[in-house]
Amino acid sequence: MVSWDSGCLICLVVVTMAGLSLARPSFNLVVEDATLEPEEPPTKYQISQPDVHSALPGEPLELRCQLKDAVMISWTKDGVPLGPDNRTVIIGEYLQIKDASPRDSGLYACTAIRTLDSDTLYFIVNVTDALSSGDDEDDNDGSEDFVNDSNQMRAPYWTHTDKMEKRLHAVPAANTVKFRCPAMGNPTPTMRWLKNGKEFKQEHRIGGYKVRNQHWSLIMESVVPSDKGNYTCIVENQYGSINHTYHLDVVERSPHRPILQAGLPANASAVVGGDVEFVCKVYSDAQPHIQWIKHVERNGSKYGPDGLPYLQVLKAAGVNTTDKEIEVLYIRNVTFEDAGEYTCLAGNSIGISFHTAWLTVLPAPEKEKEFPTSPDYLEIAIYCIGVFLIACMVLTVILCRMKNTTKKPDFSSQPAVHKLTKRIPLRRQVTVSADSSSSMNSNTPLVRITTRLSSTADAPMLAGVSEYELPEDPKWEFPRDKLTLGKPLGEGCFGQVVMAEAVGIDKDRPKEAVTVAVKMLKDDATEKDLSDLVSEMEMMKMIGKHKNIINLLGACTQDGPLYVIVEYASKGNLREYLRARRPPGMEYSFDINRVPEEQMTFKDLVSCTYQLARGMEYLASQKCIHRDLAARNVLVTENNVMKIADFGLARDINNIDYYKKTTNGRLPVKWMAPEALFDRVYTHQSDVWSFGVLMWEIFTLGGSPYPGIPVEELFKLLKEGHRMDKPANCTNELYMMMRDCWQAVPSQRPTFKQLVEDLDRILTLTTNEEYLDLSGPLEQYSPSYPDTRSSCSSGDDSVFSPDPMPYEPCLPKYQHMNGSVKT
């Protein structure tokens, strides 16, 4: 609770955890004293933009407190009083630091105490020479420029010593750090890293790190104070070894209340019907909460019976609002009622700041009377000619298609074919972005099949395959003699999947066997099955690798059947993984006393959702549309890492009968967006709809969406705007995120980037002790029971609301008030 002498009162609830602060308004209330003149807001609370001073380590630094009539001047750093020492000298209004170091970075303040009042100036000091997170521009001038002119064997040597001169790196927390050790040798040397003299492993650091062997670099993102230390790169081959050591110092950021740029927002004038915008630049290390407030009148008065002003919150940060969006207030189609006082209010865990501006509305100038002119016959003629040409083109296309259709041979009416040889060159289908890495040109034939068709009509198309040829891809080809096939894992769209052991498929462990999954064709596979499997393999090559998708590890394409080697997920698909971990009483089986394999917490479910959002964000960045995102298509590894699968499958979206069940009994329509369901339009936003259903599956521990709802009834309910109820043990914020994913208009749904940001924030603020209270029966989520617990549902086995208002689906019992949620 913060109060001012002028009578302005704001109450904020601030949550701070792990360096992240989140400010939310407890009450959208601003109280100003009636004696305060609106034209002259109290300047004592308007903090001007602080002076920024930067210095390199070892340089002198001087700050001057330019405040007049000071009886006494005191200095503080990050709120702690400063005094003279062997490095710091205070003389009058000057503060001098002899040799600056990274620990001198922070927020400095000088306070001048006068006879009747006091004043304060702020300085931001930054003593660092840090790498930026995008500091990869020098990756292209690495050791690749050095090529051995001869085959002479030699020990490793440094190729760019100028990039290694800086040994001390002092960076602020949350920055990205990159250390480079460009080297060369013959044979090509290997590189490994030590931290403080010990082997540096991924598990030694939260978030891990990246090693780019081709650029001889180590990259650590979002560094924290625990990352301080000495980092040594060791480059060696059989002829020698060299090493180089860097020292990393991480400087913690200095906390302070939000600082608003002076002069913003500025007073503005606009004519009736025009547009106007107010800009409020906020500087805050901790996450700020920003609101735009307008002083309004009620019944001709600006103040109520209790003497408090009437206020209206125009704009506040929501679940999917970024700081850049909230810093600007747009007013469209201005009217005289929009004139008045507007306030930008910013607060964080340290304090609150605000600036005020005025909007003046002017009457619109009278328009001169326009006299009608003669029609532009030339423009009319151009339009008519254009329409005629378009009609001719459409007619030509229709006639060509009809002609091609009549020429197609009817093989069913031909006599039996005893022998036919054909070659089918399948071209690469580029469905991802142009910058995606690929090992072959897009015009390279993927596979050439030579087949012999049997005269028996019932024989499979490839039952008599004599050969098929695939060009060898050295980047992905894996030796067959190092692959040992194991037990079957199941049957997929193109054939079967088996477990296998691959020796040396991990380049960092060339002699160790790694458990993998191998996709292969069945004996009765068709040409389409083969082409689909090849297409899936090529799609996975182009998309690249990510932690939260099933990655391609290699392929066996030569001298034998086609094997596609992918990552192995030992814990199966997410749907069964969640069901196996339900508390007793939620099982489908009769054994209600069975103890679940692991005890799930609320944070576990949020983490699962966050990982899948990151995987979908990566696929969206590669221009890949999944089209079948569901818990059954997510696999779980031994370390509980979520991996999205089947994103490279070829799907015939034009020949799907959505009114029939699939072979495993699940209806794909329950995960499909309305535009995909009714119009066969698949976009990244239709994947967002499916992600909302996937969230519902996660927070019901593998529940079936829309249990017991017939498909025909489901179509009707979706068109009427009905949506599923909030699952138990799901917060209102997460449920509102699901509802945002289920917006009827695709453009109103959040992007995966926004979902990642929101889930990252929720995950950071979630404790580990929030265990799920799911011991009750599962009738709300099980297709075997009617829904009797939902507060807004009726009928057997329904998850919808009874008697919804037109275009207004049933929501949980809370309402939106000026961008906030009232419960």
UniProtKB/Swiss-Prot annotation:
Residues 27-128, 156-249, 258-360 form the Ig-like C2-type domain. It is found in: Cell membrane; Golgi apparatus; Cytoplasmic vesicle. Residues 483-772 form the Protein kinase domain. Pfam families: I-set, Ig_3, PK_Tyr_Ser-Thr. It is a single-pass type I membrane protein. One of its GO terms (cellular component) is plasma membrane. This is Fibroblast growth factor receptor 2.
